[in-house]
A protein has these predicted regions:
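Short beta-strand->loop micro-motif that forms the acidic, two-metal-ion catalytic signature
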Residues: 49-53
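Catalytic core of pol beta-like nucleotidyltransferases
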Residues: 1-30, 39-44, 55-110
Length: 110
C-alpha cells in the first residue's frame, strides 16, 4: 500500500478526505483510493474510486447516503465524479473478494 503524495495537491482528494474526517472522525480506520487514479493510468475525466473503511458500521446504506451527499458537493464544486463506498473496517483484512483484492493491491492510503 502506497501513501498518496497527490493527496496534498489534488483538491478533490483533499476535499473528500476532509469531509470524511468531519463526518466520521475516529470511526475511520482508513480511506483508500483505488482504480485508475491509484494506478496512475487515469484520464482527465476518470472518476475517483474510494473505499472508506469504518469502525462500527451498523447501517451501510445510511452511510452510503451520507457519503453521496459529499460526492454531490464535490461534483458541484469541481465537476469531478467521486465513487466512494463504506466498508466495515474488518473487511480490509478479512474479505477475499476480487474487489477487495484490487483495493489492497493497487490502493493508495489517503
Amino acid at each position: 500500500m502506497r501513501v498518496a503524495s497527490m493527496a496534498a495537491t489534488d483538491p478533490v482528494i483533499t476535499g473528500f478526505r476532509q469531509a470524511m474526517q468531519e463526518l466520521y472522525g475516529p470511526r475511520i480506520e482508513r480511506v483508500v483510493l483505488y482504480g485508475s487514479r491509484a494506478r496512475g493510468d487515469a484520464k482527465p475525466d476518470s472518476d475517483y474510486d474510494i473505499a472508506v473503511f469504518l469502525r462500527d458500521l451498523s447501517s451501510r446504506w445510511q452511510e452510503v447516503r451520507r457519503i453521496a451527499d459529499v460526492e454531490l458537493a464535490i461534483f458541484d464544486k469541481t465537476g469531478a465524479m467521486v465513487h466512494a463506498m463504506p466498508y466495515p473496517a474488518e473487511s480490509w483484512r478479512n474479505t477475499s473478494s476480487p474487489l477487495m483484492h484490487e483495493i489492497r493491491k493497487d490502493g493508495v492510503d489517503l
